[in-house]
Amino acid sequence: MKTASGSTKLKATDALDSRPHIFGRTVTSTFRKMFSFRHQPPGNLRTGMIPPVVFLALLVNIPKLLKLRFYLKQERKNRPGDDVRILFYSDNLDETNGIANNLRNVIPYMRAHNMKAFLAGSAFNTRPCGAVENSYCILLPRLFSMEQLGYANSELAIPRVGPVLRLLKRYPVDLIELETPSPGAWLVCFCAKVAGIKVFSHYRTDVPTYTRTLVKAKWMYYFVLWLMKIFYGMTKPVVSPCRDYADILTSQLKVPKNQVKILPRGLPLEKFSPDLRGKGVWEQFNGTEVSAQTVRKVRFSFIGRISKEKNLEFLNNVWKKFAAKHDDVELMYVGYGWYLEEIKKFFEGDSSVHFAGEQGGDTLASLYADSDFFLFPSVTDTFGNVVVEAMATGTPALVSNYGGPHDIVMDNEAGHILPIEENAWLDALEESRRLYLEEPEAYQKMRETAYERTRKYTMQSSTKAQFEYFRKLKKEAYRL
């Protein structure tokens, strides 16, 4: 296989990733193998290595960055002012999460519609080298990586700077949007500033709340909050997908209000449709045959990453009490994550709960459509891709009253917006069950409203708004 740099070839026997294949991702080329520090679990010593590695990587490459600065300045003069080129960078691009999935959908759409967008991140530690997936997603060779504290199957990584510089010379950009405030993003930020590239950020992850939820050490929350203030102070303006987090950026992270821009996200909703309902996909995972079901149960689902910060411990307790009262309800968990085995153990012997594993394509879309109600109690999501996807198949959603999802759902019309209180969720589940069983016309109206609500989150509307903002940002940054 030819490498991204065009210099060497890997052997046909070389494994490109020791993880199971992730749906929809195909390696189209690779980087040559490069030195990296051995991947390690989190620890004080390992964490203490991050700042020296970041600053050493920056210092070593300053001469090349200054040379790149001069090259990009000349190249930019030869292009029209409204010709904007942007690089989206996320350290967690090589994982299964909402950020990675959203970016991997948005960037191909932008490129297909003549928007000059590029996507890069760090290759996961299970890869022997960097790679390019689907001809557009650049997973850079890593210099350093360690497991993320309190968050299995995720890592903190620092990419090698050399390949980044070569790619920026080959594909010059005007703007870099940083998606996550991780070590690699700090390094890219510093390098971009030296190279004279305008850098800004997108508040996609509520890192302080994640830290408070997943890490036992209380001091870590305040330390992370301090780091976030510095990071978002360096990467203004900051894009927020919803009002709640725009307020957090100004109140907690001290970003000036005029430096916060609300830009709702878009999703490729054409693959999600109410027409996929009733095709027999749900029955493949709940242990029954379509013909064998005399009475169809009321179906609830959670679809997404199975991890604790999604507030699934709360959902488990609520469901246990709700299902104890009814034998005509069932809950389907769809997805994979480090918390999955704990949930299976919690529901061991409970016939009302099923697990479909990680799914994609038509199977995933059909599971959304087959659900009667979608449950999403997370209080850490800045947007809620899965909520939009569920509603795009006509499935009403029950969400928390905090974060991005409650901006999507219309309370009592396309679902319910609820405080994180067990009684409130139990009452909503009871009402949802009653509505489905006793008022089919009202339930169908709710499905139609949910579907119509998602039309504002199409890829077309969101990318158009984004690029209009990017053009404005470029003109302000370079005084064009």
Model regions and ranges:
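Conserved acidic donor-binding segment of nucleotide-sugar-dependent glycosyltransferases
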Residues: 411-412, 416-423, 432-437
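Nucleotide-activated donor-binding/catalytic signature segment of Leloir-type glycosyltransferases, i.e.
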Residues: 341-359
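Aromatic "clamp/platform" in nucleotide-sugar-dependent glycosyltransferases that forms part
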Residues: 379
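Nucleotide-sugar donor phosphate/pyrophosphate-binding loop at the beta->alpha transition
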Residues: 198-200, 208-230, 277-279
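Carbohydrate-associated surface elements
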Residues: 123, 244, 266
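Short hydrophobic beta-strand element within catalytic cores of glycosyltransferases
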Residues: 396-399
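Short alpha-helical donor nucleotide-sugar binding micro-motif in glycosyltransferases
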Residues: 168, 358-359, 366-371
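Conserved donor-binding/catalytic core segment of Leloir-type glycosyltransferases
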Residues: 88, 284-320, 332
